[in-house]
A protein has these predicted regions:
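C-terminal binding/interaction regions
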Residues: 14-17, 93-146
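Single conserved hydrophobic/aromatic residue that forms the stacking wall/gate
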Residues: 1-11
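A generic structural motif
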Residues: 29-34, 62
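A short beta-strand-loop structural module common to alpha/beta enzyme folds
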Residues: 32-43
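Glycine-rich phosphate/diphosphate-binding loop of Rossmann-like nucleotide-binding domains
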Residues: 9, 13-29
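Mid-chain, well-packed structural core segment of small domains
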Residues: 67-113
């Protein structure tokens, strides 16, 4: 974990409104974050935002990351191309909790088209507050890199 517990945010146009809502959640908790974009609802290419976030998480400059796009799939696929990234597509609190407990996910990905603000609040809080269990789960994570 980065000592500053900074959060990296990447958002595609379908997640822009949810991005602004998530920033309010983070602000209310006094958590610092770096917003990697986008800054509007205009169409954009998610890899242009995903790669800088992934590199920042890998370098320890921000931790954890939060990414939002329409379905969440494209940005999750892009993020997971990076060796040090375990991006988890989550749309419910329990999925986010398990992604942290069992998979030590370091980037939360949410589908902007398919998650309400209420569920996003619970999902973000679960992701930020759930520790990794380690043990047998660490053994499995150690087998991920090629």
């Amino acid at each position: 974990r980065s000592p500053s517990r900074g959060l990296g945010d990447v958002y595609k146009r379908h997640g822009y409104e949810l991005k602004e809502f998530v920033k309010q959640i983070l602000d209310s908790k006094g958590l610092a974050y770096k917003d990697f974009g986008t800054d509007s609802t205009e169409s954009c290419d998610y890899p242009d935002y995903a790669h800088p976030l992934a590199k920042a998480v890998e370098a320890g400059k921000v931790y954890p990351g939060i990414a939002i796009c329409g379905s969440g799939n494209g940005i999750a696929m892009t993020l997971n191309k990076h060796q040090g990234i375990r991006a988890a597509l989550c749309w419910q609190e329990e999925i986010a909790r398990l992604a942290r407990e069992h998979n030590n996910a370091n980037i939360l990905v949410m589908p902007g088209r398919f998650i309400s603000q209420e569920e996003a609040t619970h999902t973000v809080e679960a992701f930020l507050n759930t520790p990794f269990e380690g043990g047998r789960h660490q053994r499995r994570i150690d087998k991920i890199p090629l």
